[in-house]
Amino acid sequence: MGILISNDAAKVVIPVKLSLALPLAVIVFGFGYFVWLCIYNLYFHPLRRFPGPKLAAISRFPYSHLLISGKGHRDVLDLHLKYGPIVRIAPGFLSFSHPDAMNDIRGHRKAGQPEHRKDPIRQEVHIQNIIGANRADHTRFRRSLANGFSHQAMLDQEPIISEYVNELMKSLEEHSANGTQQIDMVRWFNYATFDIIGDLSFGESFGCLQSSTYDPWVQLIFNSVKNLVYIGALKHLQIVPRRLLKFILPYAMPKGLSTKHAENQRLSAMKVRKRLDTGSNRPDFMTSMTTKRNGESLTFEELTSNAAILIIAGSETTATALSAAAYYLGLFPEAQAKLAQEVRTTFNSAEDITITSVQHLTYMLAVLDEAMRMYPPAASGLPRLTAEGGATIAGEYVPQDTIVDVWQWPLFHNPNYWTQPDDFIPERWLGDPKFANDRRECFQPFSTGPRNCIGKK
């Protein structure tokens, strides 16, 4: 049987079998390439000597699934308990659970040593804020923000912060009917932190405490978290070229998400413009960012982007830490009683509680540290790409261009480094000899190095 193609010049008969040759060749080539890639990743890849699941060594799918499973932090811990402190969790990706790893990956590099770059798979380039900027711009942004996060700045900002804390306490009394009704503390902590950071960033709050609900912008942040996780997992698969992915992502997002994102970018710019138009020198983040230093100043776009990132990075993380502390104090009444006694024997009235005076509450500080160990606000990691020439991480040489990471939750719950890691015990931070072997140096909830959290103080 054949296909007859005719024209004025000639008649050509093409066998049907030949018409199937091209797709068949593509299938055979694709299968052959997949088999070759599996063999290469298992036996010839530069990371072949590192332990881990065989499927993870040949495919990125297991790690992408781990990212969207909702229990990735526990899965990563299980992998480290099975394979050791270094696990190959994807073909070119190493996960570390070792006390030295975080400093080796994110710590200060020696003079002349290149910085480990942000993971290019999930990190966009040319971002105009302190989170995603390159080394030079990050230094410039951090310098512009430094005064806004200094100890003196916190003292100057205390009246602003205290106003919202007092409003929070008043709202809690009112909505809990003086402690007789249950309330959602996670929401109320978020109301307060978003109002505080909003005021310090834009000169006005979001009004969450007053309205007892989330501002639409704040609500969008929570609604989009899952979508961003799915997008990150899709990027990690690297099935679609990055340039093409950037084009199709807006169409793959839930309906209206791109529009809302653009709208909120517009609102952020509007809030920054409104704050700048006041000409105020109040002790907030915007005053710090707009103060010229050594002739340097930030563009309007940089001001807008950094102010917006402060809202996300400074609000939800703080609320998460406070929520964790409240949750575990509720689970462990003996710890709650000790903390209550410390506070009530230290202060005679609420007016005595200040940013300076609370620094002497040793048990309270231990409670906060233990809460962040048990439930770190950044439970997963911030991947890096090893610099040119490779690096020694946790005592092992890692080739250049390897994605490396430390997940905080698995590290903080690893029984190799912590006594009773799954128990909430603030005393471990107060010199109790029972916990003398805890590797407290690996407790870095604010990260470490030149890109550690500027709000650590």
Can you say where each PLM-predicted feature lies in the sequence?
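N-terminal targeting/anchor module and adjacent flexible "hinge" preceding the catalytic domain
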Residues: 1-104, 121
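Cytochrome P450 heme-thiolate "Cys pocket" and heme-binding signature region
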Residues: 147, 308, 313, 355-356, ...
